[in-house]
Amino acid sequence: KPLAIDYMNAGHVAWTMGDIQKAAALYGKSITANGNRERFLEMFRKDEEALLKQGIQEDDIPLMLDLL
């Protein structure tokens, strides 16, 4: 069974490929697997720099988090 980090990483891939809906769904699964949103956010924040390097716009990050 996939772990929370697996769902998060899959969400990152979907997002960088432009599939926002799939990314949000995968991030939602990561939150559920983590058991709470705060733990998800801690993990997500650690990956922000990598997301920016992959072409995600800094202004889009809070928008994505609002979708969750």
What does each model-identified segment do?
Residues N34-L68:
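Terminal, low-structured helical/coil segments at or just beyond the last alpha-helical repeat
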